[in-house]
Amino acid sequence: MEQVKCFIPETLEEALRIRRETGATILAGGSDLMVANSMGAGVTPAFKGDVLIITNLKELKGIRALPDGSVEIGACTTSAEIAASSLVPELLREAASRMGAIALRNSATIGGNIGNASPKGDMPQPLILMDAEVVLTSVDGERRMLVDDYIIATKKTALREDEIITKVIIPKQDFTHTFFRKIGMRRANAISKLTLSAAATVRGGVVVDFRASSGAAGPKVARSRKAEELLIGKKVSELHT
């Protein structure tokens, strides 16, 4: 059996070069990937190919507000860091705070949660609702696309073999009301059976923007477009009668 190589680059530039040359599997927090390749307790996981560990790359960490009001989140920023940041929209903070156990939230990254493309992932749903974009980087440069377009189906994404998810961009949000609900077999440390998200902007008693989606019930997050169209333009007083 051919020996699997493990690469630990010191810079993003080095990581991109290795990714181009080897096509190695990207590993950040490893909360899903380590489980998927587990051989049992106390046994080294058996990866089927080379592994590129990017957890230590400073270029992929941190949260910052941009001049246009959008928020940039590095791909290796953890769920716990996102949940604790006042820069992050409330809808995403709530979803991040609901992910699994505390230990998992301290290791799971936003890039991994998107890249894993699991319909049960907690963070992609609010990201899709907010029209967030993912930045995909290779040695040739960057390209940006909506998270909704990046996740094609269960475990299927638009990531190319030489690319790495480097950041997520959330456009400026002006929602006046947001909602996130996760349904699982228990209150904590649960895998989602169903997730529901909604966000609305109400001005002068009128719904000027409304978005809703569900997750974990299909191959990817589903926007409730018809429900959105029905509510936009309605007076809030009409919705209570």
Locate the predicted segments by residue.
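C-terminal structural segment of proteins
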Residues: 1-241
